[in-house]
């Protein structure tokens, strides 16, 4: 495509097929989002929803991984982040397939009739505490504008019967999120615990829930091997995206 695959640009992250500027977004491109975007199951999906789209990273990763017929809706409450997501998407190969909506997800859903095969979110997880100096960062970090019960309710309102709702969270918070989801009628179908290396306990967890009951497949992903290079499993998961992998 463009210069994004050949020239490293500032104020963002250069991937193999697209560039994500994030200087106007409270939360930057990071390993959590990259893991989630590469891991979420996309087989057979027709319509995807990204809740809290931020810079547009997840929507772009899903677009790269899916066929040209798949439509992706990216909903972001914060106007500056939504504007930057739109710019990132406009410069990508998939601008015709991704729709950015500057909106509160709860209000936006009241106007929708479509259902989604895949819903994805890298949600806030801090409880309200010391206020951030930047309101946009507080919104991105804390569960004040969309708490976890509300997020699960939103997803339940618009998912298909066999669809998946995927999130990434810190390990302990993910365990609590799972208990909450199960109590609300969701079924855990996929779980990957993520550790920095073999010697460390998992610090992140990737979760996929569905309205439909079924077996839960669980595994563990180690990011770095003994030599501190990326592990074979992490490389296999993310090499379609990282520029120098």
UniProtKB/Swiss-Prot annotation:
Compartment annotation: Cytoplasm
GO biological process terms held by the UniProt record: methylation; tRNA processing
GO cellular component: cytoplasm
Entry protein name: tRNA1(Val) (adenine(37)-N6)-methyltransferase
Keyword check for Glycosyltransferase: no
UniProt cross-references to Pfam families, sorted A to Z: MTS
Keywords, ordered alphabetically: Cytoplasm, Methyltransferase, S-adenosyl-L-methionine, Transferase, tRNA processing
